[in-house]
Amino acid sequence: MEALIASTSFFVPISNSSSSHIINNRFFPSFYSPNLNFGTFRKTSLSSSHLVFSSSAISAPPSSTVLTRNSYWMVLLDKPPHWVSSKSAMVDYYVEILAKVLGNEKDAQVSIYDASFDTHFGFCCHIDEDASRQLASLPGVVSIRPEQDYSSEKKNYGIGSHKGVSLFDHGTVKHWMVRIDKPGVGIVTKAQMVDHCVQLLSKVLWNEKDAQMCLYHVSWQSDFGFCCDLDERSAVELAGVPGVLAVVPDNSFESLNKDYEGDSTQDSRDQDDSESPPVKTKKLFITGLSFYTSEKTLRAAFEGFGELVEVKIIMDKISKRSKGYAFLEYTTEEAAGTALKEMNGKIINGWMIVVDVAKTKPFRQNRSQPSFGL
């Protein structure tokens, strides 16, 4: 099921003269539409808010250009910071985001050919698949998806309110049932199983948020698997992901009782998480954190369950930014067990976190001792 939200676009006419440009007052007319189509653009020497339109609006790639699969992409973003208010400032903001992947603003300016400023925030760009993967991992990027009809004047930036969003070409999406291997011992709750399935699916979709939106069912206690909306090409790719046993059509899409093992026995996947056996631990491992969540915020969220010995968010040594996961340690196992049960799947700074038992490091004494094996 797809949710399509139509939105109008303002298409800038193409001049036949290679030297003619459209200056700022025409680039952003008073009757502007939330979406703006443009070709390559650059800043003039007048000011950073004055943009110049080049005469090469995207309509079809040159015959000499060899395009890789999926070269045109639609990028959806979180709402820009409040100080990015004007339309020209938003374009600069979009360019800065893309420049983090391409390496410089000039290439980013040339690659962007459409932008949306109002209800939905984002842009369309012409980049290769490797760059699209890097772009999908940047903070503030909600999703990135191929845009097949890149020459269309009307762009649909809406992601909808349903899980079956328009990540794929219209009419190509099908419902699939995915059977997977039994997860590791650390996955003991439904929220952890959801996170595990998202990780598998994101190997195909490249973006965890897109993977979350495509999921619509998870089985996690007896039969292991999930159901999702994909096109056939993505389904074939998913079947080759390690840990995936089979990808078959979901012939019982309307039913909540899914037959992951080929029989019709009633499973117990809807039992309460509290029936899971208690885990003895003082240390917890938190994943799914927003890159902007601080140790102070994390401590405030967890200290209500007991005294904390340590709160440590793991930082990237190069970028000095959070990697999105952290470790917590309580003074008692009871406090840690309660926090594990109550906080798993909760929302912190707009992101759903997954709380797990912190695993000890593997025993590696044999590296420093002689081997007595045959």
Curated annotation (Swiss-Prot):
Q: Which residues form the RRM domain?
A: 282-360
What keywords are annotated for this sequence in UniProt? Chloroplast, mRNA processing, Plastid, RNA-binding, Transit peptide
Question: Looking at the keywords, is RNA-binding present?
Answer: yes
* Cellular component GO terms held in the UniProt record: chloroplast
Main localization of the protein described in the UniProt heading: plastid
Subcellular location per the Swiss-Prot or TrEMBL entry:
Plastid, Chloroplast
This molecule's function is given as: Involved in C-to-U editing of chloroplastic RNA. Functions as major chloroplastic editing factor. Controls 62 percent of the chloroplastic editing sites. Binds RNA close to ORRM1-dependent editing sites in vitro. Binds the editing recognition trans-factors PCMP-H51/CRR28 and PCMP-H12/OTP82.
Would you tell me the protein name for this molecule? Organelle RRM domain-containing protein 1, chloroplastic
Q: Write down the species.
A: Arabidopsis thaliana (Mouse-ear cress)
| Name of the gene encoding the protein in the UniProt record | ORRM1
